């Protein structure tokens, strides 16, 4: 007979998960198939080659612009530097997750199907109120998926703002120059400052201006897929892990309940809880191994980008307020990007800290010798909370987030002082 919990997990697996779906599509657009059970990986290699060629072409064009204007002023090419960093990090992320695509797809599969909770044996025990227990566990999981969808789609909307700005800016600029300013000559400008190399063959250019224009237009889209796709994947995995810990906390809290768990079943019930703890610990280690080094890269680059944006904001305040809206959206996107890592990791850590107290507060002192022994062992194991590290150097937390922003502010002050001199 199939476990009731397994049956419920299959039902939840079939429910639409908008946030995770967009994450999968974003990764797939870069040639990284993190959900092979849903779609084929046949053309992923070709997609990655195409994405790499296009991204390197755009990066080369941006670097060419930076070198051309290097001696003028930093304000002239700061936007090109920002985009170069974003595209470069996107390429690094693409290769990183492709190298770990098996681990990544396994985590996504485990998260979506509830593999960690399957075959626990909990609902094969002789419990009087299995329905109540099952509905409570199911409610925790469903609410957790709702939170995941809300967070991911909120980040989706934020990341879309600078992408839309870059995509529509040349068209609005063209309308303004030709019809509002009433210039004698007007032409379509490039999406952002860049020098795309081309060959002049008589009256023809290769690649043509149209191709160069749309090449640069694709840049913000590649940034979107890398920023949204892989950062939101971290949110999905860690949020789901915190949901698993919530389920375990609920089970531990009721391990000595006379209503839900009879006294003769408590040792077996607690064994199921211990089994779940071991699985969550293994799941956590997989997330840690997948993200710890790429988070270090992301935090370092985000710190530099925030510093440059602060500098750009200071120059805009002096020159005018025309670009302030766009720069603030860009700033919010990058700040939110690094904040999501820390807030999601902090949530997991907070839940694991609460789990330690739940093991201790479950009235274990009135139970059997075997029950007491298992509780003591779990108190020993759960003293070490589930933390996610930054390259193995420090842990993601609210404290680390403050340090990143403080470091960015210090770099900004240093940059401004150097420029003034």
Curated annotation (Swiss-Prot):
Belongs to the insect chemoreceptor superfamily. Heteromeric odorant receptor channel (TC 1.A.69) family. Or63a subfamily. Residues 1-48, 93-151, 239-289, 337-384 are cytoplasmic. Interacts with Orco. Complexes exist early in the endomembrane system in olfactory sensory neurons (OSNs), coupling these complexes to the conserved ciliary trafficking pathway. Pfam families: 7tm_6. GO terms for biological process: detection of chemical stimulus involved in sensory perception of smell; signal transduction. Keywords: Cell membrane, Membrane, Olfaction, Receptor, Sensory transduction, Transducer, Transmembrane, Transmembrane helix. Odorant receptor which mediates acceptance or avoidance behavior, depending on its substrates. The odorant receptor repertoire encodes a large collection of odor stimuli that vary widely in identity, intensity, and duration. May form a complex with Orco to form odorant-sensing units, providing sensitive and prolonged odorant signaling and calcium permeability. Involved in the behavioral responses to ethyl acetate, pentyl acetate, methyl caproate, anisole, heptanal, 2-heptanone, r-carvone, nonanoic acid, and pyrazines. It comes from the Eukaryota. InterPro entries: 7tm6_olfct_rcpt (IPR004117). GO terms for cellular component: cation channel complex; dendrite membrane; plasma membrane. It is found in: Cell membrane. Its main location: membrane. This is Odorant receptor 67b. The keyword Membrane applies. It comes from Drosophila melanogaster (Fruit fly). Coiled coil: none annotated. GO terms for molecular function: ionotropic olfactory receptor activity; odorant binding; olfactory receptor activity. Residues 70-71, 173-217, 311-315, 406-421 are extracellular.
């Amino acid at each position: 007979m199939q476990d009731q919990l397994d049956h419920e997990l299959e039902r939840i697996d079939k429910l639409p998960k908008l946030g995770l779906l967009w994450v999968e599509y974003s990764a797939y657009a870069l040639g990284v198939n993190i959900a092979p059970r849903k779609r084929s990986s046949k053309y992923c290699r070709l997609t990655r080659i195409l994405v790499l060629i296009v991204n390197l072409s755009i990066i080369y064009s941006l670097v060419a612009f930076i070198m051309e204007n290097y001696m003028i002023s930093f304000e002239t090419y700061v936007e090109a530097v920002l985009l170069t960093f974003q595209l470069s990090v996107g390429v690094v992320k693409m290769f990183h997750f492709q190298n770990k695509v098996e681990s990544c797809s396994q985590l996504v599969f485990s998260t979506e199907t509830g593999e960690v909770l399957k075959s626990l044996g909990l609902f094969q025990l002789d419990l009087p109120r299995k329905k109540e227990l099952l509905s409570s566990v199911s409610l925790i999981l469903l609410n957790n998926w709702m939170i995941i969808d809300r967070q991911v789609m909120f980040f989706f909307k934020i990341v879309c703002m600078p992408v839309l700005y870059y995509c529509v800016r040349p068209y609005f600029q063209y309308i303004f120059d030709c019809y509002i300013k009433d210039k004698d000559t007007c032409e379509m400008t490039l999406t952002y400052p860049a020098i795309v190399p081309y060959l002049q063959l008589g009256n023809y250019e290769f690649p043509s201006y149209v191709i160069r224009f749309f090449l640069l237009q694709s840049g913000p889209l590649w940034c979107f897929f890398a920023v949204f796709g892989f950062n939101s994947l971290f949110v999905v995995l860690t949020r789901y892990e915190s949901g698993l810990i919530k389920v375990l906390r609920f089970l531990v809290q009721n391990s000595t309940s006379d209503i839900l768990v009879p006294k003769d079943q408590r040792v077996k019930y607690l064994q199921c809880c211990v089994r779940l703890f071991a699985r969550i610990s293994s799941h956590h280690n997989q997330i840690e191994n997948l993200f710890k080094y790429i988070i270090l890269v992301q935090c370092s680059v985000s710190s530099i980008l925030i510093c440059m944006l602060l500098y750009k904001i200071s120059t805009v305040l002096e020159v005018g307020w025309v670009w302030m809206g766009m720069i603030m959206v860009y700033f919010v996107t990058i700040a939110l990007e690094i904040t999501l890592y820390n807030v999601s990791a902090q949530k997991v850590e907070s839940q694991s800290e609460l789990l330690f107290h739940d093991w201790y507060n479950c009235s274990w002192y009135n139970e059997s010798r075997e029950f007491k022994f298992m509780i003591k062992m779990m108190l020993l194991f759960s003293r070490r909370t589930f933390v996610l590290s930054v390259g193995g150097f420090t842990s993601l937390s609210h404290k680390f987030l403050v340090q990143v922003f403080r470091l960015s502010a210090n770099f900004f002050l240093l940059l401004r002082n150097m420029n003034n001199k």
